[in-house]
């Protein structure tokens, strides 16, 4: 696939300002996440550990998908530039907060956890309505801000209806649906719903036990088939005085 010319963020004044790297937040096998500043704004840079054509194209693809998304529960993609202090990089909104694991370690209330569940469902429902599967829903890809609102991040493994990557495995072994781990690729919304079920188990396992069991069935056709269906089941459970 040919490498395209650099894509700049639409805000030309913002894009021409110098980027100052402030530190590495995390580093994986392929990518580094940097906190940075451009002018007076904090931003996130996602750059390749090994700068080559393949990883640059992955970053560009993530930009092309992320730039089409706009939702309060999804991190904003600002641009992609090849000439940054970190090399070719995806430029993202900086979200102050902590990972879902860190948030849960503080022992939040049931109502606070329910708000997080609702935010995740809102964000994933928006993605699915736009023909996008996140394909890597896990605690480290959920950021909780100081107000207790959740944002979904990292669309590097996401798949859209017109994607040439539909058959890719993707996901993280601890949270991926069985069909993905078997190399069959995602089974539509049901694969993201499997991962959401595991997140709900981690947050409120006892409260939503039967709902989780259905989310996490091995056969994707036996799971909830859409976020609205899952949302209705959760709303019904919250209304009941005892576990169902």
Model-derived segments and spans:
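Activation segment signature within eukaryotic-like protein kinase domains
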Residues: 116-117
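Conserved short submotifs of the Hanks-type protein kinase catalytic core
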Residues: 85-99
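Short beta-strand micro-motifs within the conserved protein kinase catalytic domain, predominantly
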Residues: 76-88
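ATP-binding glycine-rich loop module of kinase domains
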Residues: 29-57
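Conserved catalytic-loop aspartate of Hanks-type protein kinases
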Residues: 192
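Catalytic-loop of the protein kinase fold
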Residues: 128-144
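AlphaC helix of the protein kinase catalytic domain
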Residues: 99-109
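AlphaC helix of the eukaryotic protein kinase fold
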Residues: 53-68
């Amino acid at each position: 696939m040919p490498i395209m010319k650099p894509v700049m963020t639409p805000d030309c004044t913002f894009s021409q300002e110098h980027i100052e790297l402030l530190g590495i937040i995390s580093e994986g096998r392929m990518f580094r996440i940097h906190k940075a500043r451009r002018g007076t704004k904090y931003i996130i840079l996602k750059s390749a550990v090994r700068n080559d054509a393949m990883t640059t194209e992955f970053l560009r693809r993530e930009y092309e998908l992320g730039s089409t998304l706009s939702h309060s529960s999804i991190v904003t993609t600002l641009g992609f530039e090849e000439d940054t202090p970190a090399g070719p990089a995806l430029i993202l909104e900086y979200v102050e907060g902590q990972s879902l694991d860190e948030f849960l370690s503080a022992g939040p209330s049931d109502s606070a956890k329910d708000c997080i569940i609702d935010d995740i469902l809102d964000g994933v429902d928006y993605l699915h309505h736009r023909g996008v599967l996140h394909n890597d829903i896990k605690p480290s890809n959920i950021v909780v801000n100081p107000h207790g609102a959740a944002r979904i991040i990292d669309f590097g493994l996401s798949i859209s209806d017109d994607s040439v990557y539909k058959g890719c495995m993707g996901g993280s072994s601890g949270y991926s649906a069985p069909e993905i781990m078997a190399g069959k690729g995602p089974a539509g919304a049901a694969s993201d719903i499997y991962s959401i079920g595991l997140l709900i188990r981690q947050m409120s396992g006892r409260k939503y036990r039967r709902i989780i069991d259905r989310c996490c069935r091995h056969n994707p056709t036996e799971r909830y088939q859409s976020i609205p269906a899952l949302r209705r089941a959760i709303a019904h459970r919250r209304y009941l005085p005892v576990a169902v």
